[in-house]
Regions:
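Bacterial N-terminal signal peptides that target proteins for export
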Residues: 1-9
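Predominantly soluble domains enriched in secretory-pathway, periplasmic, or organellar proteins
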Residues: 13, 18-344
Length: 344
């Protein structure tokens, strides 16, 4: 489905009661969290209208959708105090029971890869995965880093990257293959239990800059770019050598999110305003002063638009990626996390 039709400047208030489900969820939907109202807005990207708002619990920060586009998962962060993921049925437009993460407190960054929900747990200095098919957390790995905040999981889940804000580092976890362990001895009269999975995880911790938070992996999988909020710089990591190969003095103090465009040509950074860089030359090409108080960034899959959460001014800005100009906005109170939900 192509969503990148030309649009004029459009502002949509779309004030709906939480109980209203006046319109069905579109097959391709934009999801936007409101940290102020503690809700998830389901937005039709064709009309930029909010079709539903659904409660998601306290302090929602990040959102991700399942591969089939039917379910959304939201991290209830609480700066380390909370330990739940909210679950939303996007078709029925209703909240489902929370996922209790137990001691894995401070969930924040999310990814949905290989049928599982991957999450960071800041207060536990760990990451984990939740399997919706079994309803269980099936994997946990400590990082040993302070404020493990955002996560990127490669297809196949054999490589995982995280940013660790207070440590000023990036963690790369690589899975090495090996034979499975021997089965455990079964109780009398029962079948043998499966042995532990083979292989191991190797961790590489890469120092970057102060306040490393927002990051993204280039579409070709060769580089990771990291926004360092404390330094106002961007670190470029070569993922083959696992080393920093460039530090860009982009003048982006407070930068908290960074995303590549789908074609890999540009990089968008939120740092009070929206900053656009050329990925090849690693230079700033534009600063959009009218996109204010910026937070989460989401790319439209066809590369026509970007969506930027502007929390202090209460809307999600729509950016035309051809003109690099703001083309409209959708009113969402205190927006932050953004995601796509696409049903076949």
């Amino acid at each position: 489905m192509r969503l990148g039709h030309r649009l004029g400047f459009l502002s949509v208030a779309a004030v709906l009661p939480l109980s209203a489900a006046a319109q069905p969820t579109p097959k391709a939907a934009l999801l936007a969290l409101s940290k102020q109202d503690h809700t998830l807005s389901i937005i039709d990207p064709a009309s930029l209208r909010v079709v539903a708002r659904i409660p998601v619990g306290d302090d929602p920060h990040e959102v991700i959708a399942s591969a089939d586009g039917r379910t959304a998962y939201v991290s209830n962060y609480g700066f380390g105090a909370f330990h739940t993921l909210a679950v939303i049925d996007l078709v029925a437009q209703k909240q489902l029971p929370f996922i209790d993460l137990g001691a894995l407190r401070g969930p924040h960054g999310l990814a949905f890869v290989d049928g599982k929900v991957w999450f960071t747990a800041e207060a536990a200095k760990a990451i984990g995965s939740y399997n919706p098919a079994t309803g269980k957390i099936d994997w946990i790995m400590g990082t040993g880093q302070n404020r493990t905040h955002m996560i990127y999981v490669f297809p196949g889940a054999q490589r995982i990257l995280t940013t660790n804000v207070n440590s000023g580092t990036v963690t790369i976890l690589d899975h090495t293959k090996g034979p499975a362990g021997a089965p455990a001895a079964p109780p009398p009269g029962r079948a043998p239990l499966p042995g532990p999975p083979g292989g191991d995880w190797n961790e590489t911790v890469i120092p970057v800059g102060h306040g490393s938070e927002g990051f993204d992996v280039s579409p070709d999988g060769k580089e990771a770019w990291v926004a360092n909020a404390g330094d106002g710089t961007i670190s470029v990591i070569d993922l083959a050598s696992k080393s920093v190969v460039a530090t860009i003095d982009a003048d982006v103090p407070g930068a908290n999110r960074l995303k590549f465009t789908p074609d890999g040509r540009r990089v968008l950074v939120t740092a009070g305003t929206l900053v656009v860089l050329d990925a090849a030359t690693r230079t700033v090409v534009k600063r959009l002063a009218d996109v204010r108080g910026t937070g989460g960034i989401l790319m439209q899959p066809d590369g026509a638009r970007a969506y930027v959460a502007c929390s202090p001014v209460g809307y999600v800005a729509v950016i035309d990626l051809k003109t690099l100009a703001m083309a409209g906005h959708v009113d969402v109170a205190g927006p932050d996390g953004l995601a796509w939900a696409v049903r076949p």
